[in-house]
Amino acid sequence: MVVVVDTVSDKPIRPRHPEKAARPDALSPKKPDWIRVRAPTSRGYADTRAIVKENGLHTVCEEAGCPNIGECWDRKHATFMIMGDTCTRACAFCNVKTGMPAALDGAEPANVAEATAKLGLAHLVITSVDRDDLADGGAAHIAATIRAVRERCPSTTIEVLTPDFLRKDGALEIVVAAKPDVFNHNLETVPARYLEVRPGARYFHSIRLLQRAKEIDPTLFTKSGIMLGLGEQRSEVLQVMDDLRSADVDFLTIGQYLQPTLKHHAVMSYIPPEEFSSYESLAYAKGFLMVSSSPMTRSSHHAGADFAKLQAARAALPR
């Protein structure tokens, strides 16, 4: 018999996803050859990680287990996840910790601004956990972070990827009033899969959130994304595109769902690259100004370069 003694900490380790612990393992098919990423070992990666840690910040790159972290951090592109590392929702696809979050860190907006300056980011993406425990869903904290970055890095463009602010009246208005350049809220999947994949959310509430953001500020770029491989049908994906266009959404991202752990939703299918290309063509035909559709596409992947293309596409529209 072998006895393993933990000499590092005497504190019990809390499960990352306690609500999923009793679930049976969900087995996914083997990853195909086109799902490949390189290990994060570069100097740029190490430098980015050091800046994130010295400012006491969290990133969705780490917390959600993004497969593109090696590529992005090598270029010193990081997406900050504010309001803590613990989410009040328990989506079946997400690797972010779940539970009761800690109190907000009042120094976080300034720390995000400082890290943005140190990384030299021309385009910053800020996302967050859901904070259903807060009266405004964290909207004022998001707005404060936007303002802090504007003051510290006035030339940096800002993209926010927000929660849905369900039952948080006035929260959206607070965020939009802070004047981000891009307002992003991901639908994640088709409406028929919400009960199983995103049970705490409401599909048409999310559609309306995106529509309302553009109504409040017509100069705002709006953006949303979905994952494929969760059991959706092609016709349902096309309907999501139509729903987003009816809400005047400018930018659509489509990527392959990858299972974080065996306790998360299984991958039902791996979508081949040519089908992603087909969806991209159809989305452009439906009127999106910008579309990014590939197996490895994620909301903030190449966000800066894509924002420049988005600006150019709007500028080219007939007056």
Curated annotation (Swiss-Prot):
Instruction: State where composition is biased (Basic and acidic residues).
Output: 8-29
Catalytic activity from the UniProt record: [[Fe-S] cluster scaffold protein carrying a second [4Fe-4S](2+) cluster] + N(6)-octanoyl-L-lysyl-[protein] + 2 oxidized [2Fe-2S]-[ferredoxin] + 2 S-adenosyl-L-methionine + 4 H(+) = [[Fe-S] cluster scaffold protein] + N(6)-[(R)-dihydrolipoyl]-L-lysyl-[protein] + 4 Fe(3+) + 2 hydrogen sulfide + 2 5'-deoxyadenosine + 2 L-methionine + 2 reduced [2Fe-2S]-[ferredoxin]
Q: Which InterPro entries match?
A: Aldolase_TIM (IPR013785), Elp3/MiaA/NifB-like_rSAM (IPR006638), Lipoyl_synth (IPR003698), rSAM (IPR007197)
Q: Name one GO molecular function term.
A: metal ion binding
Identify the residues that the record assigns to the Radical SAM core domain, covering every copy: 73-289
The main place the protein resides is cytoplasm
Q: Which Pfam families match?
A: Radical_SAM
Where is the segment annotated Disordered? 1-29
- Where on this chain does [4Fe-4S] cluster 2 bind? 87, 91, 94
Keyword Mitochondrion assigned: no
Q: Where in the cell is it found?
A: Cytoplasm
Q: Cofactor note, please?
A: Binds 2 [4Fe-4S] clusters per subunit. One cluster is coordinated with 3 cysteines and an exchangeable S-adenosyl-L-methionine.
Per its UniProt record, the required cofactor names are: [4Fe-4S] cluster
Q: What is this protein called?
A: Lipoyl synthase
Gene name of this polypeptide: lipA
